[in-house]
Amino acid sequence: MSTMTPAEIVSELDKHIIGQGRAKKAVAVALRNRWRRQQVEEPLRQEITPKNILMIGPTGVGKTEIARRLAKLADAPFIKIEATKFTEVGYVGRDVDSIVRDLIEISVKQTRETEMRKVRTKAEDQAEDRILDILLPSARPVGFGASSGAADTVDEGSTTRQTFRKRLREGLLDDKEVELDVEQPQVGMDIMGPPGMEDMTEQIRSMFANIGGGKKTRRKMKVKEALKALTDEEAARMLNDEEVKTKAVQNVEQNGIVFLDEIDKIASRNEAGGGEVSRQGVQRDLLPLVEGTTINTKYGMVKTDHILFIASGAFHLAKPSDLIPELQGRFPIRVELDSLSVNDFESILVSTDASLVKQYQALLATEDVHLEFADDGIRRLAEIAYAVNEKTENIGARRLYTVIEKLLEEVSFAAGNHSGRTVQIDAAYVDRALNEVAEDEDLSRYVL
């Protein structure tokens, strides 16, 4: 679990997301409260439930990006999923219980990786020994009953072994080929199951995956590759699978986070039925999950009482009040995200750690073409993106992808023929490339 303070979390989010201070603070406090709850004594700890968050804002302003970055910071089981993937129980499609099943799979993988890191050093030593046994089969220490004359051979072999171990750790033997027995990876089988029968489908899939598991095959590979394969094999052997499963379930129950995107798409604006699968049915199915229930998974029963749910939606066509009242009540914290201004667009282009400008400069630098963006060029790009959003559909920061792609279309196409060239992107260059398209509203609808 992350031990970062809210200020540290917001600072980390600021590196990738421009503006939206209220949303950042809300998720930062929610994440910190997970840690705070763990410090509370047990009788009261069970009573402290997470305060779920509903983020409301137009498309392209950073809702999904906050989720992506939060997943990396959380250091806890985290799943981002679209509400539109689910259908009401009884219809063809996935039911909402599969959210928890997917989350527990993520937790098992995380827990396994964490436990493997703990035994990594020991596993590496054992893998080195197995490699050295292959490289120096005669240098192994002799057992009981060895003649006294063999002692010198053992000492000499031990010295040689240490020399080879040193060379192995320095990477001097990486390119040498060895032949060894390695465990066959478990090959999964994709099985289509009926809706509502995910547990049975998963058990059948696991049964087929275990067939042939544990068998060894003889392979030739480089020492570097063999060392990695043997280290993974040794580390996996040291793990207690039951302990991993228990920790994974506990981690989901205490620290799990579900980010439910596009929740506005299941908000129904009218009471009349239609040809579509009932949206209200999906909302009703979500209720017990968000409130707290017990879901049966292949790793055991998982309680959802302390899982944090963060929902987001643009709410262009529907309003938060169009959600059924019971579901509204289960998201007590509401945060509105602001539409992006010209200044925000400008900051998105240059101020974030992996800004669009840096990405395109790095891409074209691979062909020895150097892009230099002048300040007035950046400003003009931001103004055009903002203007097109105002005149046509407002798709937020995603408009910048379209605009900059159109701007650099010719440069990217001919990059191979202009090695060593420096391209200066100023306001005049931007106007020449985009003005005609940006000014023509009909054309910009299709091109930008």
Swiss-Prot record:
One of its GO terms (molecular function) is peptidase activity. A double ring-shaped homohexamer of HslV is capped on each side by a ring-shaped HslU homohexamer. The assembly of the HslU/HslV complex is dependent on binding of ATP. This is ATP-dependent protease ATPase subunit HslU. Keywords: ATP-binding, Chaperone, Cytoplasm, Nucleotide-binding, Stress response. It is found in: Cytoplasm. ATP binds at I18, G60, V61, G62, K63, T64, E65, D261, E326, R398. Belongs to the ClpX chaperone family. HslU subfamily. SMART domains: AAA, ClpB_D2-small. The gene is hslU. ATPase subunit of a proteasome-like degradation complex; this subunit has chaperone activity. The binding of ATP and its subsequent hydrolysis by HslU are essential for unfolding of protein substrates subsequently hydrolyzed by HslV. HslU recognizes the N-terminal part of its protein substrates and unfolds these before they are guided to HslV for hydrolysis. It comes from Paraburkholderia xenovorans (strain LB400). The keyword Chaperone applies. SUPFAM superfamilies: P-loop containing nucleoside triphosphate hydrolases. GO terms for cellular component: HslUV protease complex. GO terms for biological process: protein unfolding; proteolysis involved in protein catabolic process. It comes from the Bacteria.
